[in-house]
Amino acid sequence: MVTKEQRRQKIKARVRGKISGTQEKPRLTVFRSNKQIYAQLIDDIAGRTLASASSLKLEMTGSKKEIAAKVGDEIAKAATEAGISTVVFDRNGYLFHGRIKELADAARKGGLKF
């Protein structure tokens, strides 16, 4: 029987074969744990992280969805400071629902296009 984590890893590998980030259009990848949420802008060609934001850095209170939205705002601010306006969204095998959706919507409101 395939567990949820094995399913996510399988989807992640399949999607990563199809999308890649560049300097001009980096990959916005999201990692979600039970308590925290992390977002990174990655240039896959150079193998560098251009910007990052996480709920650990912000030390916020509120619901998990509210915190995810704040992380989305922070990654959008970091991207505009780095001169990035368009990204490729990598949900990392997670369903586009709940905290992942909140982060993506907040990043879009912050000015990122994907």
Swiss-Prot record:
Q: Does the keyword Iron-sulfur apply?
A: no
| SUPFAM superfamilies noted in UniProt | Translational machinery components
Q: Which Pfam families match?
A: Ribosomal_L18p
Q: Which GO terms describe its biological process?
A: translation
Concerning Gene3D superfamilies, the annotation shows: 3.30.420.100
One of the record's GO cellular component terms? cytosolic large ribosomal subunit
Sorted alphabetically, the keyword list is:
Ribonucleoprotein, Ribosomal protein, RNA-binding, rRNA-binding
List the GO molecular function terms: 5S rRNA binding; structural constituent of ribosome
Residues that span the membrane, as ranges: none
Question: What do we know about how this protein assembles, alone or with others?
Answer: Part of the 50S ribosomal subunit; part of the 5S rRNA/L5/L18/L25 subcomplex. Contacts the 5S and 23S rRNAs.
In UniProt terms, what function does this protein have?
This is one of the proteins that bind and probably mediate the attachment of the 5S RNA into the large ribosomal subunit, where it forms part of the central protuberance.
Q: Please report which protein family the annotation says this sequence is part of.
A: Belongs to the universal ribosomal protein uL18 family.
Mind telling me what this protein is named? Large ribosomal subunit protein uL18
Gene of origin? rplR
